């Protein structure tokens, strides 16, 4: 046992200790600065390729003295980065309000022989600290005195009640932390203790966990990996097309137009013109609206997920949830309610209910506050709640019973006794409550030993905490003499547990159906962890074996190489320490899994930070919430399943937009390529292309993002980790629609060229409007991608989608009717509008027919 001076530290010793060990403040994780948040947006691979396009566009602009396209691309970059920055900064601001920490809570310490109350931040190593029921332990320390002391370690180990003692004979060898050690951030559930502070601030267990929670994982988000591949593909395609156009145009100029016959100045100017056209193709290959659109989709999902109790702090987490293949969850407070509840109380004598209620109420030091929350020992509080459910109010019963003597619970005795003068019968009664095997041994024979033993065995099999109640009349006024002399009546056994949240089994079932493995990682006992897993549908005694369950001690003893062959089969890890969970996450990621971690305690923070997505509980510790990407405001595991549905639906919507956007680019590049080969000018102006590529695409992204999440995505397996964002089905649709559009548009151009010998502004206006409405109707094909329903079904849930489409159509009509020289248009007759809208709609009708045939197959 640690040596200490009961008088505490002197003022000089306090100052010296503070100089050596510092203040009792855990260094909070640094919030990203405004500039870092903004700079992070430029790490997006598509933004980088846009920056390159902007530089090339500026170079072309200097040659042609026209910077319209350059300004458009730069505006697209600014909008995309600023929107993402604003939404993440706003989420960070909301989170700060949610997660304020108070280090000024008063703590009782003995210093220089006198009791003082000092702020928690001022406690130093060596201080003698006094703790009692309801208080939070301010520092790590070793107990020098413990009276009926029970600690709620749920924030560190997941255990609600841990007995603490200074008697080595009663130490628990299986406990996660020694029985005479108490840790910062845990709470005193019952009793009283005196401790000597051994570590403060960052040196405490909570401080070390917090430090680990700031270590950044180098894992790239699934969406970023996809966008990196997409940007490389776009870049390569642009370069190949650019080289092809340069070679074709140069060959045509040399072999058909006799370029080499002119003077060197004319040749140089012509070659420069060819080079600028080919560079323009690279610029055109870049989808300017894509970053803005993806950012908008993520931002809108952030806002809409907030309505389902998911406060998203980091934007990428919206989509990453859809790629999750494994969820590692703690038990206490996430799967369970983090409060004890009497599941069953079996009576063994004929004592009237009112008298039994008096015995339970009087022989307890717990209270229920005005909200019904338990103050004091959680198991005793659960008994009071049980009385309330039976229609018995403990307060008048306790007030009516005069307390004669009380013997508090201790780890050594394993029972509590109270002598009362009954307010109901007027008799003097000794009331006893404690471990069933201890209390039963004090009772008079009643022939029920076998029945009681069988009942207790059943409760133990269900990992319940059991508490026996007994009583006897007595003439004694001393508890110990009364218990020794009396032949107690065995009144009953209460079986308590931390109950599973009502919505958890269904939510876990949804995740399992969606192909997501769920793993429980808890500091609780193996039996309790298995029972909870059984209740939520995760553990099957007939199917699961010891290979699916491991203790923290076994886990720590194995090498990474040994564990890599085991972790994917693991369903439960019990008696886990904080860093075990982080190591498990790292190993699962090495196996190719995308890991989400849930937790509410300080012990969960390192894993929350290291996971692909960290999900903390709204009522969790500040350390856990700081380390997470998403905070579940309703503390519900069901919100995790909802977040997965949102993530998968969001990824599908992003795919739809990529399909829509790249179809536009594919068609525009093909038209430009053919035009360059045949020597015709580009039929679309830069301003018209910017309207299509930036403004219209932004509206299209909003339309796709507005689509409601589809519950059907939860029937699918997680997408393969290395699956490209452009699937084969997308590529087929893209090329088919793109080629049809190009054929229609080029057909129009060649027909006009043959019949009229040139292109008028009216014809170019018809061309522009046809191009836009082909994209307009193609949005329906994008909406219908990977769905089992007609795009025109579920109109009620897609109101925003159709309103945005209406805005695009109205915008196009206004541009044509009033755009004039800026957009190079002239007004069209209503019959021309009818022909354009009607004929271009065939691309949506055709897509609908193809999908209907596919559904029948």
Describe each region flagged by the PLM.
Residues 750-759:
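Long hydrophobic segments that form regular secondary structure
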Residues 1-717, 725-726, 739, 753-754, ...:
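Conserved cytosolic headpiece of P-type ATPases
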Residues 707, 733-748, 773:
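Alpha-helical transmembrane segments of multi-pass integral membrane proteins
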Residues 760-764:
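Transmembrane alpha-helix entry/boundary detector in multi-pass membrane proteins
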Residues 696, 741-742, 765-780:
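Generic alpha-helical transmembrane segments
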Residues 720-734:
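Hydrophobic alpha-helical transmembrane segments and their immediately adjacent juxtamembrane loops
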């Amino acid at each position: 046992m640690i040596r200490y001076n009961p008088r505490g530290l002197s003022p000089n010793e306090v100052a010296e200790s503070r100089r050596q060990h510092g203040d009792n403040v855990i260094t909070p994780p640094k919030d990203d600065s405004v500039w870092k948040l903004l700079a992070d947006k430029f790490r997006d691979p598509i933004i980088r390729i846009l920056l390159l396009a902007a530089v090339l566009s500026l170079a072309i602009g200097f040659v042609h003295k026209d910077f319209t396209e350059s300004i458009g691309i730069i505006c697209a970059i600014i909008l995309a980065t600023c929107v993402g920055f604003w939404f993440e900064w706003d989420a960070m601001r909301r989170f700060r309000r949610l997660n304020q920490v108070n280090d000024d809570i008063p703590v009782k310490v003995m210093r220089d022989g006198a009791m003082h109350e000092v702020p928690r931040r001022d406690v130093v190593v060596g201080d003698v600290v006094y703790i009692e029921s309801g208080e939070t332990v301010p520092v790590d320390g070793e107990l020098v005195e413990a009276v009926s002391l029970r600690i709620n370690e749920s924030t560190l180990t997941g255990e609600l009640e841990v007995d603490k003692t200074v008697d080595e004979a009663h130490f628990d060898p299986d406990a996660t932390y020694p029985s005479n050690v108490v840790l910062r951030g845990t709470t005193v559930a019952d009793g009283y203790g005196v401790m000597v502070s051994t570590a403060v601030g960052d040196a405490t267990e909570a401080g070390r966990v917090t430090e680990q929670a700031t270590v950044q994982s180098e894992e790239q988000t699934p969406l970023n990996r996809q966008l990196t591949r997409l940007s490389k593909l776009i870049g390569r395609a642009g370069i190949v097309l650019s080289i092809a156009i340069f070679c074709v145009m140069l060959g045509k100029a040399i072999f058909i137009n006799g370029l080499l016959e002119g003077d060197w100045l004319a040749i140089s100017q012509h070659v420069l013109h060819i080079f600028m056209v080919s560079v323009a193709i690279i610029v055109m290959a870049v989808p300017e609206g894509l970053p803005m659109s993806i950012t908008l989709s993520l931002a809108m999902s952030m806002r809409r997920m907030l309505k389902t109790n998911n406060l998203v702090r980091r934007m990428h987490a919206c989509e990453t949830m859809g790629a999750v293949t494994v969820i590692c969850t703690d038990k206490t407070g996430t799967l369970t309610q983090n409060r004890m509840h009497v599941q069953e109380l079996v009576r063994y004598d004929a004592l009237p209910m009112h008298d039994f209620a008096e015995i339970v109420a009087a022989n307890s030091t717990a209270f229920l506050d005005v909200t019904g929350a338990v103050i004091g020992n959680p198991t005793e509080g659960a008994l009071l709640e049980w009385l309330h459910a039976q229609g018995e109010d403990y307060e008048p019963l306790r007030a009516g019973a005069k307390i004669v003597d009380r013997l508090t619970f201790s780890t050594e005795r394993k029972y509590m006794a109270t002598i009362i003068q009954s307010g109901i019968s007027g008799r003097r009664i000794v009331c006893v409550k404690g471990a069933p095997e201890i209390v039963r041994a004090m009772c008079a024979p009643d022939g029920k030993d076998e029945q009681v033993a069988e009942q207790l065995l059943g409760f133990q099999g269900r990992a319940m905490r059991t508490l026996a109640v007994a009583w006897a009349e007595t003439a004694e006024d001393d508890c110990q003499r009364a218990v020794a002399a009396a032949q107690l009546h065995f009144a009953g056994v209460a079986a308590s547990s931390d109950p599973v949240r009502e919505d958890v089994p269904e939510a876990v079932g949804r995740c399992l159906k969606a192909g997501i493995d769920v793993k429980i990682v808890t500091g609780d006992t193996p039996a309790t962890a298995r029972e909870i897993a059984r209740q939520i549908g995760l553990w099957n005694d007939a199917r699961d074996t010891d290979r699916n369950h491991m203790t923290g001690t076994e886990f720590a003893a194995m090498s990474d190489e040994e564990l890599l062959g085991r972790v994917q089969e693991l369903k439960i890890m019990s008696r886990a320490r904080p860093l075990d969970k982080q190591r498990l996450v790292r190993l699962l990621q090495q196996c190719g899994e995308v890991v989400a971690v849930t937790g509410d305690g300080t012990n969960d923070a390192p894993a929350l930070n290291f996971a692909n997505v960290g999900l903390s509980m709204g009522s969790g510790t500040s350390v856990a919430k700081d380390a997470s990407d998403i905070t579940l405001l309703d503390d519900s595991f069901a919100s995790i399943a909802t977040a997965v549905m949102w993530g998968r639906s969001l990824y599908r919507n992003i795919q739809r937009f990529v399909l829509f956007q790249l179809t536009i680019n594919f068609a525009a590049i093909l038209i430009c390529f053919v035009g360059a080969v045949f020597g015709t000018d580009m039929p679309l102006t830069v301003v018209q292309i910017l309207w299509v590529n930036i403004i219209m695409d932004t509206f299209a992204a909003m339309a796709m993002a507005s689509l409601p999440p589809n519950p059907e995505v939860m029937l699918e397996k997680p997408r393969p980790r290395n699956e490209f964002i452009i699937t084969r089905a997308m590529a087929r649709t893209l090329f088919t629609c793109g080629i049809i559009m190009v054929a229609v548009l080029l057909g129009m151009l060649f027909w006009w060229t043959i019949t009229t010998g040139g292109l008028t502004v009216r014809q170019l206006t018809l061309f522009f409007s046809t191009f836009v409405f082909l994209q307009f109707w193609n949005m329906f094909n994008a909406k219908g991608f990977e769905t089992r329903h007609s795009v025109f079904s579920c109109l009620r849930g897609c109101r925003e989608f159709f309103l945005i489409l209406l805005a695009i159509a109205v915008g196009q009509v206004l541009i044509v009717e009033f755009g004039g020289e800026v957009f190079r248009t002239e007004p069209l007759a209503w019959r021309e509008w009818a022909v354009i809208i009607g004929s271009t709609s065939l691309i949506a009708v055709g897509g609908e027919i193809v999908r209907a045939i596919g559904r029948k197959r």
